[in-house]
Amino acid sequence: RADSTCVDSAAAPAAAEGVIAQGVAAIMGADCSGVTGAIASNVAVPNGVVMISPSATSPGLTTLDDKGYFFRTAPSDARGGQILADITKDRKVKSVAITYTNNDYGKGLADVYKAAVEAHGIKVTTVNAHEDGKADYSSEVATLASAGGDAVAVIGYLDQGGKGIIQASLDSGAFDTFVLSDGMIGQSLVDAFGKDLKKSFGSMPGSTGKGSGVFAGVAKAAGIDSSGPYTGESYDAAALIVLAMQAGGSADRASIAKNVMDVANGPGTKIYPGELKKGLDLLAKGKKVDYEGA
């Protein structure tokens, strides 16, 4: 295990190199889009190591030259941005300012969201990047406030600059309605701002299929909150690696890459969260499986 940092695309490959040097068969991760792309391009793909990210959502990763070694279990922001725009329209927002964390995830989602809200007839007053890791965001909020808007869309991270944007907005009275990207969704934000978020809304990936319901039960039995951001997607990423190993009868890196798509799709016996033993047993007998994720 190694820390990809989420925000440092220079340090992340070094962390991944250390893991690969230990002879790992595959990588579950990374988390954020920028570091995921850096690790995939510079470390994982050149070394023939499968990566399955549960949470890297940048549209740019769709066209990554991954040679068949990169996968993800979360949908692209190409869809997520449209959903967030649809919700913005439903909330009858007429104008919105946009601020995004200055990385691949932030820029990609901001571009999709801007185009989608404008297609709904919503005015975008300004689009500005913000840097993570600052102690104060009053200057960034002042710029957003000068452009105006019924709300400000905060595309970022709840423990980084995104939280700082909200704090500075509330302190100055610039905005009281926040449109939150998936990276901003989490209990810590509610704990920090409570009722000050009562006008705010956001979106995060999820599923209403059978696998989602099954996973909720499995997670509850294990004392895990299944509603947390990318919890189900993380389970799915690990499950696919294990099933791909069994399908090929080997922890060989090339074998895993060859079998990921086979176990993730039909034909085959449906395997749901909590049924990995069943799936492994079927694969050991030469049968096909179709993993239906959380």
What are these model-predicted stretches?
Residues 1-294:
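Extracytosolic ligand-binding ectodomains
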